[in-house]
Regions:
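Iron-sulfur cluster-binding cysteine motifs and their immediate structural context
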Residues: 1-19
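Iron-sulfur-associated redox domains of electron-transfer enzymes in respiratory
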Residues: 16-229
Length: 229
């Protein structure tokens, strides 16, 4: 999706800005919680989750947490699938674009795709269970999350990109307060958005071989190899 947006020669692709939706939830008095992708640490130099939480509260959010909380739930589900040993091949992907690629162009390998929700969905579900009636806004780098929200609306109510958050903060005069210390610690689930991060976060079973694939071309090659046996 990002590629289509960048290269479209007619400039026909337009990103949907979900900031008005997020603002609307806040303005009408909903309790709004932010699920922040762990890649924020790469997007914002010197930022930790406490600094991010403080800024988001100034915008009107009730609270904010890392999507990595959901990733911890997801990685446990992956480990259960491996422990059950019902599948000899398991495709794990938290990337909505890759999952859509499989559904549209590689339906033959769909049985191998782990039936596990994404970290964003898991975190959203957890927040909504803990705070009935709350709205959840995902904040991250990927525009395909907007489509994921549309397809699975029970978990998260809208998705913002970091660019949209930047514009909202600038418009509202909100800046990061770098005096906030991160008291949450790390956790292996923060590795999820990195290359091979899902595998790095898991407890490895020596009876299985683990491979990580990055990039659309390599993903397609790997899917074709699985399809062809």
């Amino acid at each position: 999706r990002d590629r289509c947006y960048v290269i479209c020669p007619q400039n026909a692709k337009r990103l949907r800005d979900d900031t008005p939706s997020a603002k609307g939830f806040i303005d009408r008095g909903d309790e709004v919680y932010a699920s922040v992708a762990p890649s924020y640490i790469a997007n914002y130099k010197g930022i930790n989750i406490e600094i991010m939480r403080s800024a988001l509260k100034k915008l009107g959010f009730k609270d904010a947490g890392e999507t990595a909380i959901g990733a911890t739930i997801v990685k446990r589900e992956y480990e259960k699938l491996i422990e059950n040993r019902k599948q000899s091949v398991i495709i794990s992907s938290c990337c909505h674009s890759v999952n859509t690629l499989i559904q549209k162009h590689y339906p033959d390998v769909l049985p191998y795709l782990a039936n596990v929700i994404s970290p964003m969905q898991a975190h959203g579900q957890l927040i909504k269970n803990q705070h009935p009636g709350a709205k959840v806004v995902f904040i991250g780098p990927c525009i395909s999350k907007k489509d994921e929200v549309d397809k699975y609306p029970d978990y998260v109510d809208c998705a913002l990109t970091f660019d949209e958050l930047n514009d909202w903060m600038a418009e509202s005069g909100v800046e990061f307060d770098f005096s906030q210390e991160d008291m949450t610690g790390g956790g292996r689930a923060r590795w999820f958005p990195t290359r091979g991060g899902i595998i790095e976060s898991m407890d490895i079973d020596d009876d299985f071989s683990y491979f990580s694939v990055d990039g659309i071309e390599d993903c397609m090659n790997a899917l074709e190899d699985i399809r062809d046996g």
